């Protein structure tokens, strides 16, 4: 079973405010709106959504946990503000991979993120970030613009970033965006904006101001 409003959310979701929602996540992908939002065949729009003081308690090792969507496929996110505490409920380090303040995993048909802002704190294992945990190799041409994260990001493994944890898909575009939270992991590949990025991508008019620490000591930016 999925811990979300919808198992899979398709279509349009607009003009909604959430106050202090709480999710408990075990072994399945999860997000406040959907375990998965969008699909290859159904373009989906999430617009003008505010989430205040979301709490996600993770007590399992699901792949893909996000503030709004565990997984995003072919989604246009715009005009979104989200504050959240996404945490290790049992304090035992058994937490999911691919955890993002907004989206855990972006896959297949690329998604777009415009005027999206996240804040709070987030914990995960590998591929953890304030906005998108993991952009999968089969999801090229993802766009992030006019967006920011003020989330403090902490990971037990590698590939940790202020905005994006691991961008495996090529032709990523990030512009007019920034991160101000701290980024820390116990592995390698930690970045103020992006933990690790593959292929041909474009980063323009972006900055990060938070402290960055990778305790293994390699590939810090």
Where are these predicted regions, by residue range?
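Predominantly extracellular beta-rich ligand-binding scaffolds that present long acidic/polar faces
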Residues: 1-221
